[in-house]
């Protein structure tokens, strides 16, 4: 695969935000939200430099390119994850740096940020609210809900003229309030039991794994704590106003096979990220 082939597929989420990326189970997973350049996992080489990186868990196919993402940046990039993951990534990045220079050294070209439940980050003078949900996987794993924080005129002042609003401002009356503009939810790898706790009604887009399709692979899904298409179908049917972006297909399926499953399991609110 050519270097730039990873980034050929893209999707306009709305008038402002665009999603690009690539994902195959046990191979590579990584997405970029543009124009803010927020990376969702770090398993794919990229010509674009990140402003922030959200890491769901530490499996190699999700962090394989983290070290390279962090090099040659003018500013230290925010890398967000759980406390345990951040501690492990420190050791991982130190080892990467050591192997590249040939002697023991610490890697310091990053800004690690541990997240417990939620976090606010600032990118290009825009604030983003990040919420997390713990997922059941082979290792500690979380999903990320991402929203932009926008300013909105309070409802009680909607009918006032610009002159009246200006007078209120002069009197130090707060006429603006912050609201959340949900963008997407990015799920890490997970067992089917985690589906019960996900906020499908709260985000317009849900990027979620669908590792297995064949019925005989349900056992593999259970033993490896991944999702099978049959786990997801009830949620496609229930949350018809949510768009599901399916990723992380097992490498045992060819592209042609996945397209056949796409025809078989065809839902108007489902996008197969092939």
Predicted regions and their residues:
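Metal-dependent catalytic neighborhoods of phosphoester/phosphodiester hydrolases
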Residues: 65-72, 91-92, 254-262
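Conserved beta-strand hairpin/beta-sheet module of binuclear metal-dependent hydrolase folds
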Residues: 1-51, 142-146, 152-153, 176-187, ...
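Active-site metal-binding motif and surrounding structural segment of the metallo-beta-lactamase
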Residues: 39-87
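Divalent metal-coordination and catalytic microenvironments
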Residues: 40, 57, 79, 130, ...
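Extended recognition/assembly regions associated with phosphoester-bond processing machinery
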Residues: 1-29, 115-118, 130, 185-187, ...
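Binuclear metal-ion centers of metallo-dependent hydrolases, dominated by the metallo-beta-lactamase
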Residues: 102-124, 194-274
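Active-site-proximal loop/helix segment associated with metal-binding centers of metalloenzymes
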Residues: 123-215
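Active-site environment of divalent metal-dependent phosphoester hydrolases
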Residues: 47, 60-63, 87-88, 138-140, ...
């Amino acid at each position: 695969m050519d270097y730039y082939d990873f980034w050929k597929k893209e999707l306009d989420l709305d008038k402002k935000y665009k999603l690009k990326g690539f994902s195959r189970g046990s191979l590579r997973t990584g997405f970029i939200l543009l124009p803010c350049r927020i990376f969702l996992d770090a398993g794919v080489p990229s010509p674009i430099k990140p402003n922030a990186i959200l890491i769901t868990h530490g499996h190699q196919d999700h962090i394989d390119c983290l070290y390279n993402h962090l090099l040659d940046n003018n500013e230290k990039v925010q890398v967000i994850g759980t406390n345990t993951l951040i501690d492990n990534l420190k050791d991982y990045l130190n080892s990467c740096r050591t192997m590249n220079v040939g002697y023991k050294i610490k890697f310091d070209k990053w800004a690690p940020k541990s997240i417990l439940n939620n976090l606010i980050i600032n990118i290009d003078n825009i604030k983003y609210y990040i919420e997390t949900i713990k997922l059941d996987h082979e290792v500690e794993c979380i999903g990320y809900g991402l929203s932009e924080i926008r300013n909105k005129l309070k409802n009680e002042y909607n009918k006032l003229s610009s002159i009246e609003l200006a007078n209120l401002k002069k009197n130090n009356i707060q006429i603006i309030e912050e609201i959340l503009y949900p963008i997407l939810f990015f799920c890490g790898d997970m067992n089917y039991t985690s589906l019960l706790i996900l906020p499908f009604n709260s985000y317009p887009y849900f990027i979620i794994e669908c590792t297995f399709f064949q019925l005989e692979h349900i056992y593999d899904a259970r033993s490896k704590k991944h999702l099978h298409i049959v786990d997801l179908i009830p949620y496609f049917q229930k949350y018809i106003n949510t768009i599901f972006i399916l990723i992380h297909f097992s490498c045992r399926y060819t592209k042609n096979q996945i397209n056949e499953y796409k025809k078989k399991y065809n839902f108007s609110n489902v996008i197969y990220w092939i």
